[in-house]
Amino acid sequence: MSLDHLSQQRFADLPLNAKVLEALESNGFEYCTPIQALSLPISLAGKDVAGQAQTGTGKTMAFLTATFHHLLEHPVKTNHPRALIMAPTRELAVQIAHDAERMVKTTGLKTALAYGGDGYDKQLKAIEAGADIIIGTTGRIIDYVKQNIIALSHIQVVVLDEADRMFDLGFIKDIRYLMRKCPSPKQRLTLLFSATLSYKVRELAFEDMNDPEYVEVEPLQKTGHRIKEELFYPSNEDKMPLLITLLEEEWPERCIIFANTKHQCEKIWGYLAADGHRVGLLTGDVAQKKRLSLLKQFTDGALDILVATDVAARGLHIPDVTHVFNYDLPDDREDYVHRIGRTGRAGESGVSISFACEEYAMNLPAIEEYIGHHIAVSQYDSDSLIRDLAKPYRLKPSLPASNRHNRNGAKPFKKRF
């Protein structure tokens, strides 16, 4: 683990509640990341924060630390939730809850998830048991509020994570509905984090926060200076052979392949599964229980490759992703940054390989204008690509055994055509 992404600010030197500090130190947190170093002195003092930082920079622990500290420092006897953390996706909500578990044992505060898809009875049981902190997506939280299962009248902390993504997904009305069910901004601590502090996000902060302080951690470049970016211009008929060939040569330990449509993702998955790769498929049509299982398998190393649509581009907090492939260049230039931000996290390096094919090459100029630099172009020899591809699977079989090997039976040398 690289440490040069950390600041000189020690958690022990901040005015933290002793139980929160114990939880941090027992989990190996000694120094703050830049966003933590900037935001925590403000939020620990009880002041609202609107923070901008890239994904993978420690935003989650920044607001969790502040939330647990605030609740412990301002105890209230109630069976109602005292903190509300809103996220744009189920996966991000689950990840936040997972990270919060690091503090639950030491602090004694209880969390509960609230997201759509499945798990209704389990979620309801946790909420009715007296959760201090509700973590979830806006739609399911509103359902519980309207059914009088959750009361927001005792909320002391409101957190909005990935605020820009909330706007993109059309959740702004839900956010405002929930915020106005909570005590007024002056009676609560409100923390907002976003990859961009756009006009819309700042407007929300102005209307629903109490004179927030803005903190920004500007990256050296939008795509992260530890990510090596590479671009190929394949013909449509070369795309799949090129992907298979690059996987043979790069031999990524853990990679995510993004495509623009569910159909394309299924096609990629079929070819890779037939080729013996341990690969999972993550699209919007995959059932929630299966999605969580796939993410766990990928995180635990049971899967080496995840093929995903942009539904999974935001909110995936998976360590040690070495490679990201853009099989299709995204139509939205910001999605390029969100996609490749899955690698090169927490001070580690990463590789991003993109295909500018006949269908999506038109998206490249807008992407390069947005990230502020040209992506290095690599050439390939079409005659050297692997073309004897196995017939792709069409139905998802059980997880294949680990027979991931190259065509000579061993890990190949690093060789580029």
Curated annotation (Swiss-Prot):
Region (Disordered) residue spans: 397-417
Feature: compositional bias, Basic residues: 404-417
PROSITE patterns: DEAD_ATP_HELICASE, HELICASE_ATP_BIND_1, HELICASE_CTER, Q_MOTIF
UniProt superkingdom: Bacteria
E.C. code: 3.6.4.13
Any one Gene Ontology molecular-function term assigned to this protein's record: RNA binding
GO CC terms in record: cytosol
Free-text function comment from the UniProt entry: DEAD-box RNA helicase involved in RNA degradation. Has RNA-dependent ATPase activity and unwinds double-stranded RNA.
Protein's name in the database: ATP-dependent RNA helicase RhlB
